């Protein structure tokens, strides 16, 4: 049975999370090491191999992509093959966001993580749509959404666009479901003093969410160096970069599907896709996040905090701190899982979300 914590309970160690506490300062050693950039033996081994081949720059870039979330976004496709699109943003610089909509009932807005797309929800969205109107959106720069050559790819920029989407579609009694970077977008939307959003958002589901300032590994810092970032993308095939990223994001690498690698590698073959990845990564932990996180306690709506027990990207301690901070929150642990519960453990994730929504 998955472990449940509710806000206000005693500070206990969750079963199955040996050595873990709910303090960011005393989390499991392997998770803390991951947050600081020591990704057990997988990353260093790959980097050593690439260095021998003169491809260290690519290794750094590839692993940097994994750290943002999990996977890389589904590639560009002819727009006539997909739809619909929401035209958002200012009139002089509109952005078209692709979204998939299915089902009826109270709405759920699914917000993917850094580098992912609507594809990440493929295992759970159809079942959720049995009882809800499910809207899965591709954030700006990912999936089949526009990828303009600008720098507006922060969590704040993405939240601006989704706030407009919520209003334009007149969504009410809305549950936001956000994974990793997308969870940060969901938190920001819940905090906004935007009168247009007042009373619209009723619940939050946060999956392995970026929520607090954390140490950024050297791989991300290298993306700030134009020559290094461009060199990394050009020297090794996108499929190799994607495979490295997924092996860091998954706990059980045997669950990585070859089709998944091909799908997630596609955007790295386009200039626009590379631009979006680089500029999103540079803002993955935005300025002002510390001040923003001090306001989390003002979020009163029911919130499910769902975390993987082997997350090497956003440590378990982050989820436990969120549980203590959000006054109306429930914490659930997904066992034998890395950073992608909706992909690596979809059935367990689906059941936890359904139980929360039905409660």
Region spans (language model):
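Short alpha-helix in the alpha/beta-hydrolase fold that links the catalytic acid
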Residues: 260, 315-322
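Conserved hydrolase catalytic core segment
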Residues: 172-215
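Short beta-strand/loop motif that positions the catalytic acidic residue
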Residues: 299, 305-307
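Conserved alpha/beta-hydrolase catalytic His-Asp/Glu region
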Residues: 220-221, 235-297
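Conserved HGGG/HGGXW glycine-rich cap/lid loop of the alpha/beta-hydrolase fold
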Residues: 101-144
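Acidic catalytic loop of the alpha/beta-hydrolase fold
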Residues: 310-314
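Active-site loop/oxyanion-hole signature of alpha/beta-hydrolase fold enzymes
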Residues: 84, 90-93, 98-102, 136-181, ...
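Catalytic active-site module of serine/aspartate enzymes centered on a nucleophile-bearing elbow/loop
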Residues: 329-359
């Amino acid at each position: 049975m998955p472990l449940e914590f509710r806000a206000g309970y005693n500070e206990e160690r969750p079963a199955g999370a040996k050595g873990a506490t709910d303090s960011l300062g005393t989390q499991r050693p392997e998770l803390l090491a991951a947050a600081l950039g020591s990704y057990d033996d997988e990353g260093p081994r790959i980097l050593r191999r690439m260095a021998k081949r003169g491809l260290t720059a690519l290794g750094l870039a590839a692993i940097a992509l994994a750290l943002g979330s999990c996977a890389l976004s589904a590639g560009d496709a002819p727009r006539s093959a997909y739809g619909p699109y929401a035209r958002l943003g200012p009139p002089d610089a509109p952005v078209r966001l692709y979204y998939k909509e299915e089902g009826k009932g109270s709405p759920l807005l699914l917000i993917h993580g850094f580098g992912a797309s609507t594809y990440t929800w493929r295992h759970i969205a159809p079942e959720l749509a049995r009882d809800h109107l499910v809207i899965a959106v591709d954030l700006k720069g990912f999936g089949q959404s526009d990828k303009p050559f600008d720098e507006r790819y922060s969590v704040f920029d993405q939240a601006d666009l989704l706030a407009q989407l919520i209003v334009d579609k007149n969504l009410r009694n809305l549950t936001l479901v956000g994974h990793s970077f997308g969870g940060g977008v969901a938190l920001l939307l819940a905090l906004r003093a935007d009168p247009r959003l007042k009373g619209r958002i009723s619940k939050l589901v946060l999956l392995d969410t970026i929520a607090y300032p954390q140490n950024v590994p050297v791989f991300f810092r290298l993306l700030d160096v134009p020559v290094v970032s461009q060199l990394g993308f050009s020297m090794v095939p996108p499929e190799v970069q994607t495979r490295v990223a997924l092996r860091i994001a998954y706990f059980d690498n045997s669950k990585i599907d070859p089709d998944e690698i091909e799908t997630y590698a596609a955007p790295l073959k386009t200039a626009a896709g590379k631009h979006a990845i680089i500029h999103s990564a540079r803002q993955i932990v935005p300025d002002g996040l510390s001040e923003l996180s001090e306001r989390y306690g003002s979020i009163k709506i029911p919130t499910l905090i769902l975390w993987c027990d082997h997350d090497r990207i956003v440590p378990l301690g982050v989820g436990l701190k969120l549980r203590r901070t959000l006054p109306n929150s429930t914490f659930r642990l997904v066992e034998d899982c890395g950073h992608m519960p909706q992909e690596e453990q979809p059935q367990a994730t689906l059941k936890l979300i359904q139980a929360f929504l039905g409660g």
